[in-house]
Each structure stands twice: as C-alpha cells, then as structure tokens.
Amino acid sequence: MQLKHLRTLLSPQDGAAKVTCMAWSQNNAKFAVCTVDRVVLLYDEHGERRDKFSTKPADMKYGRKSYMVKGMAFSPDSTKIAIGQTDNIIYVYKIGEDWGDKKVICNKFIQTSAVTCLQWPAEYIIVFGLAEGKVRLANTKTNKSSTIYGTDSYVVALTTNCSGKGILSGHADGTIVRYFFDDEGSGESQGKLVNHPCPPYALAWATNSIVAAGCDRRIVAYGKEGHVLQTFDYSRDPQEREFTTAAASPGGQSVVLGSYDRLRVFNWSPRRSIWEEAKPKEIANLYTVTALAWKRDGSRLCAGTLCGGVEQFDCCLRRSIYKNKFELTYVGPSQLIVKNLSSGTRVVLKSHYGYEVEEVKILGKERYLVAHTSDTLLLGDLNTNRLSEIPWQGSGGNEKYFFENENVCMIFNAGELTLVEYGSNDSLGSVRTEFMNPHLISVRINERCQRGMEDNKKLAYLVDIKTIAIVDLIGGYNIGTISHESRVDWLELNETGHKLLFRDRKLRLHLYDIESCSKTMILNFCSYVQWVPGSDVLVAQNRNSLCVWYNIEAPERVTMSSIRGDVVGLERGGGKTEVMVTEGVTTVAYTLDEGLIEFGTAIDDGNYTRATAFLETLEMTPETEAMWKTLSKLALEARQLHTAERCFSALGHVAKARFLHETNEIADQVSREYGGEGTDFYQVRARLAMLEKNYKLAEMIFLEQNAVEEAMDMYQELHRWDECIAVAEAKGHPALEKLRRDYYQRLMDTQQEERAGELQESQGDGLAAISLYLKAGLPAKAARLVLTREELLANTELVEHITTALIKGELYERAGDLFEKIRNPQRALECYCKGNAFMKAVELARLAFPVEVVRLEEAWGDHLVQQKQLDAAINHYIEARCSIKAIEAALGARQWKKAIYILDLQDRNTASKYYPRVAQHYASLQEYEIAEELYTKGDRTKDAIDMYTQAGRWEQAHKLAMKCMRPEDVSVLYITQAQEMEKQGKYREAERLYVTVEEPDLAITMFKKHKLYDDMIRLVGKHHPDLLSDTHLHLGKELETEGRLQEAEYHYLEAQEWKATVNMYRSSGLWEEAYRVAKAHGGANAHKHVAYLWAKSLGGEAAVRLLNKLGLLEAAIDHAADNCSFEFAFELSRLALKHKTPEIHLRYAMYLEDEGKFEEAEAEFIRAGKPKEAVLMFVHNQDWEAAQRVAEAHDPDSVAEVLVGQARGALEEKDFQKAEGLLLRAQRPGLALNYYKEAGLWSDALRICKDYVPGQLEALQEEYEREATKKGGRGVEGLVEQARQWEQAGEYSRAVDCYLKVRDSGSSGLMEKCWMKAAELSIKFLPPQRSLEVVRVVGPQLIGIGKHSASAELYLNLDLVKEAIDAFIEGEEWNKAKRVAKELDPRYEDYVDQHYKEFLKNQGKVDSLVGVDVVAALDLYVEQGQWDKCIETATKQNYKILHKYVALYATHLIREGGYAQALALYVQHGAPANPQNFNIYKRIFTDMVSSPGTNNAEAYHSWADLRDVLFNLCENLVKSSEANSAAHEEFEMMLLIAHYYATRSAAQSIKQLETVAARLSVSLLRHTQLLPADKAFYEAGTAAKEVGWENMAFIFFNRFLDLTDAIEEGTLDALDHSDFQDTDIPFEVPLPAKQHVPEAQREEVRDWVLTVSMDQRLEQVLPRDERGVYEASLVAASTGVRALPCLITGYPILRNKIEFKRPGKAANKDNWNKFLMAIKTSHSPVCQDVLKFISQWCGGLPSTSFSFQ
C-alpha cells in the first residue's frame, strides 16, 4: 500500500497545538477532529468542514480549560460521538444524521479517574481505559458502566480487532492485555498477552498479528499468542524519533505508525506471512504525529500533528478502470473500493477471511459484483450494497452466473447449481441439475411477508426434462416432486412459494399446489404467462385471449378478454397494473382490476382490515360476493370477529351479523373488565361454536364452566328440546318434568302429533300414541305399534279403524299384514296385490288360493318389468308359462344364455325374429362363431357377413358370402364396405376388402390419396412390379414438393434416381445430405462434383476447410477450372494450393482465347509463364502486331516464327511485297522464293533468288522454263500475255475469252481494261450475236466494280437503251439517264422519274422531292415530324392540300396536349367546314374549356382565338352543305360560349365590369352539357362570392361539392336537383372524367360552405326577377316564353333591349352602356376587340354617341 498526500484539512499553527484525537464514522460520511482547545470539528467525506461543536467540562466551576479530550469515537450508526475527558467523564453527544442538527448530550458516564483512551466497537457498548489502569465498559442503553478488567498501570493505548469483537489495551508498564466479547471460534487466549519493552503508545491489532511501538524506536510484531514475529529497529537511525501513534487498516492488512516528520507503512504479505516495510512517507515540518484515523473503507488516512495540522492521504495498492464505467481502488490485498464513475456511488468489497482478492468482474447489466480469492467467492449487489463471501474452491473459471433474481445469485458449475443470497455469507443450498436456464429455475426469498412465517425460502428446478423438484432452502429438504408426461419448458413459483406454475412443450399451463400436492391443468395453447408482482394474480395468453386468475385458489374461475396481438410484459405502478400487448407496430395497455389484485394480496398477507377497506370500495358483483365470503371465513378462523361481522353485513346475512354483533359486545365487555382480547371467554367461544353449528362443542364449553342453564337455554332457543332434556337428565336438573310437560304441550300446540305420539310411545301409553299417530295421518306407525302388541290386536274396532286409514293412505302392504295377522286372507291378498307385494301375495296364495298362483306370477313379472327389474321377471314369466314375455325380459336384462335357452325351446317362426338381437350381442363380444350360428338360425346371413366384414374377418365373410350371394354382388358389397372403411380411416381393413375381391388398384389409389406411400409401394410391388420404379419416382417428386425430403430421398433412391435426390437436397441447401447421397449412390466422381458445388456455395476459407475435410481440395480446383469457374479456382488455390495457380492461369488463358478475349488471355498466359502460347494465339488469329509485341517482350525465340506466319498471311492476301519483306526480316529468303514459285510469280522468284540465293538461280531458271512449257501461261499476267498473243495472231474469240477470264481483285483498272478490250474486240471483229453476249457479260461486271458510265456506253454501242438507263440509275447519274431516255426512247422518261422519286424518298432528300412530287414530299415531312416545313410547303399548294396537312398537324398536337398550338393553326389558316375536321374543332373547344388557369384577364387572347376560329367555321358552314345541320347548331352554341368566355376575360381586366364577368360565369351554367360541370359551378360560385351574391355562391358551391363527390363515386345518381327546379340550368350533364379543381381549392370551398351553413344567415334559394323565376334563366317556367340572352352578360333581356342587325342578337341597354362607358374610361384594347367582334358577328353596332378615338 502507498500513501499519497491529498490535502491539508486543518492548517498547522506556529506553535504547539496538538490534535488530541480523531475519528471516522462507520458510514464513511463524517470525520471528526478534536483540537487542543477541546472543539470538535466535523468534516464530510470529501474533506470539507461542515460543522463543529464545543465539548464541556464535567463541572463548570473548574472552567473550560480544566480538562483535555483523550479519546473520541463514533457510534456504529454514525449519529453519536463519545468524548473521553481527563476530568473523569465520558459524554455521548447526539449529532444527528444531517449537518447542522442540534448537538445534545444523550449519555454521560462519570468515572473515578481520567479517561485516557476510548473505542466504540458495538451498539450500546463503549470501551475505555482509565489512568488508574482499568479498562471499563459503558452501556448507552442502560446508562451504566462496568469494569471489564483492571490493572495497576496507566492505560496508554486501546484498540480493537477488525470485527470489533476483541479489545487490546497497552499500559504504561509495557503490558499488553487482550479481551474478547466473542472470540468468533478462534480459540485465542485472553488476558495478559505480552510485556513490551516500553509503553506501547503506538498499538495496532492487524489481521494476523499485533504491532506495538513506543519511545525505544523499535517496532515489534507479535503473533496471536504474543511471540515475537518481527522486529524493526530504528534506534540507531539519528533521523528517527519515538513512535507516538499507530493505526491498522480496516482490512487489517496494513499498519501505519507515526513519528517525527514521518509515517512508516507496513504491509502484510500473505504469501510470505511477514510484514514488509513500504517506502516511508516523509514530510518536512510535519513534526510529531499525535493522532491517526483510518477511514472505514480503507481509502483515506488522516494524520493529526503536534502543531494542530490535519493531513489527508490517499491509501491504495493500485487502481484500475473497469470498462470505462467503474474505478477499482485496491486499499489492501483483501479489500477494494468499487466506484461508479457516472453516479459516484461506492461499495467496499472485502474478504472477511483476509484472502487476497484476485479478480473482480461487474456483471448482470453492471449491477452485480463477482470476485475470486484463493478460497472464497465474493458476490455483491451494487444497488443495495448487500455483499456475500462464501467458501469456493477454484474450478478453472468455468462458473456461469445468473442474476435474473434480485435477491439471489445462481451459480452453475459442473452440473451443480449453487444459490447465494446477497448479504449472507452462507450459500442457501446446492442442487444437481443439468438445466441452467433462468426459465427452468425459480427461487423465492421472503418476497412477501406472511403471518406466522418469518423466513420463507423456496426453490423449484428441473431434475430432468420431465421432473420438477421443490426444495425448502431453510430446512434443506424436498417438499415436492412433480413428474410430468412431457417436457417442461417454463416454471415459476408464486411469491409466497405455495403455488408452482409450469408449462410444457405442448403449451399446456399447469398449476401445482405444494401443500395439497395437487396438479391442475388451467390453460391450453399458452404463449405467455406471468405472476403479477406483489400478488398471487396470474396473467396468461391463450391464442387471442388474455386470461387472468384473480383468485388462484379457484383456478376454474378465469377472467378472459379478447386481444389482437401478443402479450409482451406486465407493468405495475401508480396504483394500476397493465398488460402490454403488441398489436402490429403499436403497443396497447390492457388494465387489470387492481382491486381484485389488492384483495388477494391483503388476504395472503393476513391483513384483513386492509381487505375489508378495499372491498367496501367495490360494488356488489358475484366476484365481490365471493371475496366477501372468503374474507368472512378467514376472519372467523383468525378470530377477527369485527371483520367477520362486517363481512356478513355486506353479504346480507343479517342473522349472522346480528349474532356476531352480540358476540363482539360480550368480547368487548370482557376485554374492558378483565383485559386481553376477550375472544377466549367461554361465552364467546361457545357462540362461535354455535355459529359453526357445532352445538355439541358449545354444550361442552358451557358444561366445562358448569353453565347448565346457558346450555339448556341454547338448546331451547334452537328448539332442540331432546338435547335440552338430555342435558337436564344428565345434570339432574330439578325442572326436568316441567320441561317434559312443556315440551309435550308445545308439540300439541304446534300440531306435531307424530312427535307427541313418539313421546307417548316412549312413555308406554300405546293407545294415546296410536290416537296421535292416526290424528297425524300416520296409520303405518299406528299399525306397526298394533302389530307389536297382542292386546291392541284384540281391539277389533281399533284394528278396523287402522286398516281403513291404511287403505285410504294406499299403504296396502301394511294393511295386508294387518289383515293376515287377524286371519282375513281374502282381504290380505287383495291388499297385497294392490300394494304390489307379490312375494307375500304368492306365499299367501300357495296356502290359501293355489289356483291364483300362475296369475300372480305373471302379474309379479309385469310389475318387475315396470320396475325395470327384468332379470328378476324372467323366472316369474317362466313360472307363469309366458314364453314371449320371458324372452323379452331376458333380452332386456341382457341374460343372453337364458334367452338362447328359452328360444331353443320355441318353434322356429317364434324364435327367428329374436335370434338376430342375441347375435348382435355375441358379435359385440367378438364371439363370432356363436353370432354366425344365431344369425343363420334367424335367416339373417347378410348380417353375419356384415359382422365379419366389420370385424376384419374377410375370409369368413367371403366364405359365407360366396355361399349365399352372386360374385358380382359380393364385389359390389366389398367395394362399398371398403369405401366406408376408408372414410373411417380404417385403411388396412379397406385394403383387405379390395384385395379380397381382386381390386388391388383401388387399394393403391386409396393409399395414394391418403399419402400412405409405404402401403402404396407395397401393393404396387406386389401387384404391378413393372410400375414400381415409376411409382417411386412420382412419389419422390410429390414428397419433395411437400418438403418431406427424407421420404422423397428414399423413393428417389428406390427408383435409381440418385441425381434427383442430390438436386433436391441442393435446392434446399442441405449439402451434407446431397454429399452423402452422391457418395453412397452416385459412382466414383459424383460426390466430388457435389462437394465442389457445396464448397462453391460457401466460398472463401469455409470452402477450403470443407474441401480439406473431404480430401477433395485439388480435385475441386481442377473441377472448377474444367467448369470455367476460374474465380473460385483462383480463390481456392490462393487460400490453400498456391502451386496450382500457374496451371489455373494457363487454363483460364486457354478459356479466354476460346472466348475471343485475347488481351485478357495474353495476360493470363504470361502469368502462367507460357508467353509462347500467347504468341501462338495471336499468330493463329493473325494479330501479327500483338504476336510480335509479346514475342519481343517475353519470348524472343518466337520472333522469327511470328514474321513467317505474318508473311504467310500476307501471301494469302496476295500482298507479295509485304510477305517478301517479312520473310527477309525473318532471314528466310528461301521461303519467299518457294511462295513466289507456288504463286506463279516467277519474275519475283527469279529476282529474290538472284539477290539472296544466287546459288539456286540457274536451277530456278530451268524450273521456270519447264513450268511455262507445262502450263502455257503465268497467272493474270499470263492470261493477259496469252490474250495479247491470241490478239496478235488474229484469234479474237480466244483473245476475248482470255480477257474475260482476267480476275484480279487487287487491280480493278486492269480488269476494266481487259474487259473493255474484250468488248471492243467482240464489237469490232465478232458476229453481232457473239458481241451481244460479250457485252451482256461485261456490262454487269463493270457495274460490279463501279464503272457504271463505261457499262452504259457499252450498252449504248449496241442500242441496249434500257440496260444503259439502268446502269446510269444504279450509278445515280440521273441526268444522264433522263437525257438518254429523252433522246433515245421517251417511253422510259416516267420509268426514270419513278426511280428518281424512290431514290429521293429513300435518301430523305425531301427538298429535292418537292420539285418532283409535292404530296410525297409532304407525306415524308409528316413521317419525319418536320411539321413546320410540311405546313410551309403545303401553304404554297392549294387550299385542300393545305388543310389536309393542317388537320394532320392539329391532330398530332392535340394528342400531345398542345390544343393551343392546334388552335393557332386554325387562327392562321382558317377553319374550313370539312366534316372530317369537326372532331378536331370539338376537341380543341373541349380541351380549352377544361384547361386550368383560363378564368382571368390574361386568358383573353386564347378565348378570342377560339371565338374567332369558331366564328370563321360557322361562317364557312353557312356556305356549305352542312348549313343548319345539328353540327352547325352545335358549333353556333360553342361560338356563343367562346364569346361569353372571351367577354368575361375582357371584363375581368376592368374593376367596374366585375358584375358583368360574374353574370357571364353564371350564364355559362346553362351550357354545362358542353362544359365541365364542376369547373363551371366552381367559377360561377367564386364569381358570385367575389361580388357579394352569397346566396348564389352558396348554392353553386353546394352543387360543385356534390359534383366532386359524384366524380369520386363515378355516378351522378345521388345529385339533388331541387335547387335548380324551374331554371334552364340542365340536370343531365356529362360526368367529368376527372376533378378540374385542385384539392386545396376544393377544401377551401368545403370550409366556406360549412361556415355559412353553421351561421344559418343565408336562404338556400336563387334570386328571382319580375317574372318570378330565377333571374339568369332565359325560360319563364310559368309561361314557357324564352327571352333573348344579352350579348354582354348572357342574362335574359326583359326590357330596354338593343337589337342588332343579325336576328336573335340583342343586348340589355344598361349592360351595353356600362360596357361602352368602361371602354371609354379605360381604353381597354381587349374590350374594344370584343366590340369589334360583336360588330363583325352581329352585322354592325347600333348607333351610339360614344367614340374611342
């Protein structure tokens, strides 16, 4: 351990002012320093001074300086300080828990001499030494002190051991004395231990020895029994002075001694068992150390000095940071401090046995400490500061720790589970188990306190997968073992350990009651289960149901509610309990009934007052009633009678409540008079016994107290007179007779004649008793009494009276007995028969009336049958000779043997119908032979067959059937029966039936249908062995589809289809299976291929490991290369077989070469070290440059071969010069010579020979001469030469043939020259026919080499005009072709023109085509999309052509959405009245009125263009055949609409015309057949709203919203037209295909309409005019008169009409003047344009005084 100076707590003074004593509190939070001026300073753990107080003298008269403080110590709870003073007193000050609390003296102990030292080792016990040598004990609880031991020598030092249970005192004479309060089993001696050479002022008691030092400057370490262990002698050190004080670390592993300017540190070495001195802490000017105090956690040491200074030191062996979250400070080998860096909390971990702490871990969500020493294990909970140390032998660090339980650490090691409770130094217990899963272990440690049970510690765990053991951890014995039929996968005890829940793998939830050892299954399909914390309420989930057991004692009573997700947890807090359920992506909380939970908890805890208080808050329901009943029962058992009274009141049990109330009053009175609870008073106990209906116990309690009267009163109150009289008799009570009389009188008064009769009978008065019995209507009792007394039988009148009463009461048997007794057999027999007493009747008849016996036997049998006593009736029927009845009775009684016996005695007809019933019984007993015999006797053979069939006895059934049925009927029967068996799932039986009738195919089909493939295969193999293989294959495919792979494998392999098996496993990723099958069934190399594919699927090192494991690595690399998987091959070789890499590179290069990737192949060849292969590759592909480059760079020896190869290629291309150069570079002139010879180029051959191989020249010349003679020619030159020779010889025909044979692809000039020469010779010298043939051959050949003019000239020489023209056409020499046609044969002029057009078309030369064929050119423009050029060109043509292409362009634009450009076309070129164009005009109109952004002044020109085009169209229609047609009228209407739109846009540009614009928007509504209705109503509503016409706006917006809804729904059926009745706004309008108003604007309208509707300030009616109709309607509904619309507003003109020249055109004068005035004031050009159009449309304007100049 090392000391590091931290801070100065108290600065030293200039002179002597020593610190007399210091002390740290037990909780490490406070540090006290007592100075020379007797003031106690209090510091916090960080060294900040927080408080102080002054000590006081024993007697103030001596003054404050009359004493010194010699000892000071904190109490174990850190709230008090004991101060030992030299004025013979000890004060105990209560300083409180908080700083600043008032300091009060709570104890004082006056002594006989000065207190010299003081310790406070344990609660209430202060130990102190006195100057007179005594060591005494002060008890703060009793406020008394006593002497522990006494010596004659001044006590100079006092210390305690680490546990505080032993004290050590040092005395002035050197004596050191030891005393134990508890030696803790150490066996160490007490008393004088050692005599030190000097007074041991510095005395410390460490773990393993005692260290003492003093003025002799020697430090001595003594053993446990006082022998010297070590001595440290500093007497010869001139720097050292006397040792004044010592302190041992809290762990006892270190000791610090103080002297002058120095602190000496000694550390105990456990390994060497000696003290080792550390480097001393020397501080100049510290002066003498007078006091030392070590913080309880060992982390700080404080030293007080002679000059009044206090220095604080940090003490540690080492420090480390754990996971950047915790600081571990080792203050000693066996002690360390764990500090949480984030929260600052600290825990002191210490080995109580002094073992060195070796390893510290913080586990379990950083809450739990685990540390090892050599022999122990340290555990701790950082949150609760509960620490444990248990013996633990090292197990190699293989322990597994589980921290799921907050009270217990579970340690699993080598199959053994050890439980350690935090804060306990003993393990709770150990058990053997292999199942270390927190869900399979449940520990409950005092989790809920119960009445009468202080400790409750239980464990449940798995012994094996199906056996649960429950252990009581306190006693260490087994309290329950549960053996279950299936594997357990979860278990948990409840908090009290009385119930165990567990769930098995079948998701069945079971509850086990430990006390009764009963197991109950409470839920199926349980996916979640948990006890509610703090209660015995259980929550579980079953599929979509949440199940809650509020009372687990009644597991059948479960509260269920439906949920839609999965339960994920429980949360309890804030007075409620919630079950958290995930529903999709959200979590929903289901709240439980907190009241029911609370009640159960209160009951379990025995807190019945709390349970009552809770129940009083609930309404009375069946569940609440059950809880009240439970509480009443428990309260009675616990003798809590007031609670029980309240329960019965709540339950409405008034009598019990009242009875308990009276009982409580008795108990309370007794309690007040005699003390105690009062429930033990005998009256209270008796009344409780009465409440439980245990009257004998109550009687016994009364009689024990000799309270006979009270017992009798009890019985009388209960009307139990018999017991009352019995008590009176037993106790000889004087009122016995009176009781009896009173009882009899009471019986008579209450008409209890029977009881009175019994009383009289018991007293011997028979007649009176009979009279009372008869009066009570009990003649049977009277008869019984008469029959027992002969004297009463003699009374005939009495007997008659009784028999009459008996017969009247239908007690015939008793009457018969009486008649028989008085010898009247006839009446007796009648009575017996009436009373069904046939036994007595028959016995009487046998004696008195024998003839009646048979009749009576039959009647007796009938009676027994009625009584269902059929068995007894059989013999009676036999006696009565009633065979049929006997048979029926035997059958009914199931007396089958008797029935057979009786049947065998009957004739066949009678018996036949009964045999089958008996046979059915024997068939059910499987006694088939007897049953068959009976069926046969009963002529029911078919039933016998069915019996055998159902029993599976097909052979017997078939044998029997063949005897009595046709074979085909047998087949039908068996197949039908087999189908029934199949339906019942009895497939084997069905199979036997099918096979029996030789229909195995039906059985095969059945097995296939039900997927019983083994049986199917068995039958196929037996009956169709030729189809067995195909069947296996088919089944394999089916099973593979179903995912039943192992079964599929079997069938594939049986079908010899191992490849299918392998592919199946491969596709499912089951490579091991695929490999196994391939290796077992696939021949020598199949498994290698599978292994390769497997490895490829893994890739990387995994593939290498696999292949190495299988021993197929090299084979796999070869296989990868063979299959062109070079990347995989490279990967494998790189990872494992690097020597294979060049080979793979070579194979990869060859692959790339085959693929034509030569550059990549070149690189791979070079990487493979095979550059020559790359050269050969390039040579093979005649890439000479690359070949030469590679050869020169990587293989110089191949350069010559490359040049030779290149030369060979040049020769093949007839490039002899190049070939020659290459061969000469390769220094191979001989080869060049041979090539020239082979090519017949003898002149070049001779030249080469002469220049490079002159030695062979002569031989070459001779060879040339021989070759020339042999061939007569030398190639092309030879042909030309030969031709010339023939020409010179006059053989022109042969010369022509030779010229025609010339073919030299390298010289087209030579060929042309030769062919022209041939033609020239043929024309000049050969006959015309021959010359024609030659020209026809030469002409095409010349054309073929591009000599079209020469070919044409040849043709013209022979007047072949068409061929000449074709030659010019093919050569694209059109002018020459035209000239030839024109001059030589005009018939071909059109021919040339047609080809020229085709040529221009094909070449796209439209500009040139225009001059030839304008329509074709225009079509070509259209095809090319050059519309502007097309229209421009068409403009130059006639009107019809122009408008054809205008229409085409307009159609194109409209399709592209460019209606505006289409409109502009017709503005520019006019709108002809072609019916073909009508759809275009309509489409432009529709697109324009549907387009957004047109309801503004800026859109005027667009509307004006539309208006002008439509006006132009209508003007053209008037002049056409379409005048006045429906189309004409429609376009007139469109013109009017366009005019309204244009006028509206114009009006929108001028503020004063806004009402005109609004009216135009409203007028447009009458044209909604042609306009999008939603847009029109929206614009009308908007306009009306802007000018303040809110009624109209409201109605129009309503209509607009209805229309938008109709568009969404796709139908107008739901529209309400009531607002537009009697208007000309149409109801039937086209449904717009889409919304024309954006969503935002629709929402604005919706909000406005809703606001107005809420205000209710508008009437939902349209404004009316003087006609009484809607003001914008042209038609008056009442008269049908139609008004003209105003040209300016569209509204009807009712007066002040201005008429125009054109009929039907007029304007309202006011609107007209308003419009003119606006134009005059604004000079608006658009409004002027409107007037201009009206003038043009209506034939001029009316006379007006306004001028626009």
From Swiss-Prot:
Tissues in which the protein is found: Highly expressed in the testis and pituitary cells.
Alphabetized InterPro entries for the sequence: ARM-type_fold, TPR_IF140/IFT172/WDR19, TPR_IFT80_172_dom, WD40/YVTN_repeat-like_dom_sf, WD40_repeat_dom_sf, WD40_rpt
Any single biological process term in GO: negative regulation of transcription by RNA polymerase II
Cell division found in the keyword field: no
Subcellular location: Cell projection, Cilium; Nucleus
Superkingdom classification of source: Eukaryota
Mapped TPR repeat ranges: 593-624, 692-725, 809-842, 854-887, 912-945, 947-970, 971-1004, 1042-1075, 1142-1175, 1276-1309, 1345-1378, 1411-1445, 1447-1477, 1574-1607
UniProt WD repeat ranges: 14-53, 64-103, 110-148, 150-191, 195-233, 238-278, 284-323, 483-520, 521-559
One Gene Ontology CC term in the entry: cilium
Glycyl lysine isopeptide (Lys-Gly) (interchain with G-Cter in SUMO1) crosslink site(s): 4
Assembly and oligomerization: Interacts with IFT88. Interacts with IFT57. Interacts with RABL2/RABL2A; binds preferentially to GDP-bound RABL2. May interact with LHX3 and LHX4; the relevance of such interaction is however unclear in vivo.
Family from the record: Belongs to the IFT172 family.
Record function comment: Required for the maintenance and formation of cilia. Plays an indirect role in hedgehog (Hh) signaling, cilia being required for all activity of the hedgehog pathway.
Name listed for the protein in its UniProt record: Intraflagellar transport protein 172 homolog
Originating species: Rattus norvegicus
